[in-house]
Amino acid sequence: MPESSRFGHLPWLLLSVLILVADRVTKDIFEGTLSMYQRIEVIPGYFDWTLAYNTGAAFSFLADAAGWQRWFFAAIAIVVSVVLVVWLKRLKRHETLLAVALAMVLGGALGNLYDRVVLGHVVDFILVHWQSRWFFPAFNLADTFITIGAILLALDMFKSDKSAKEAAQ
């Protein structure tokens, strides 16, 4: 991140916006290309493109609820997004890994929030499976960035914990 305070934490927010745009563009491409549950084999026996709508949360949690979950999960995403923006704003310049992690989670959360509020469901298009016997639930770029961001967040916590222990010695 640049040392200039003129732009502050803007680069991290721009990363979040870039993730949001990439997520939205890919979802639009697959919605325009595939019909529901159609599969295009990418890596035979392991990876397909597909189109699925998820009205629930991760792994279709509460997808069969009466519709209230749309606004419940949207409210959670809004609260989480506000917390992440505030957290990003309070970071010190040297906390680059943490900033990238938070920006990725924020971008992904905003991508799925858009779907949930505007469309009433989240658009998923990535399908990982093992020879059509075992299937991981379909997901999208937003989910991918949320996951990578969470992993980076955990790595940053371990790194920070190690640094704190070394400083104490």
Curated annotation (Swiss-Prot):
This is Lipoprotein signal peptidase. Keywords: Aspartyl protease, Cell inner membrane, Cell membrane, Hydrolase, Membrane, Protease, Transmembrane, Transmembrane helix. It is a multi-pass membrane protein. It comes from Ectopseudomonas mendocina (strain ymp). The active site is at D124, D143. The lineage of its organism: Bacteria, Pseudomonadati, Pseudomonadota, Gammaproteobacteria, Pseudomonadales. Pathway: Protein modification; lipoprotein biosynthesis (signal peptide cleavage). This protein specifically catalyzes the removal of signal peptides from prolipoproteins. One of its GO terms (molecular function) is aspartic-type endopeptidase activity. It is found in: Cell inner membrane. It is an enzyme of class 3 (hydrolase). Its EC number is 3.4.23.36.
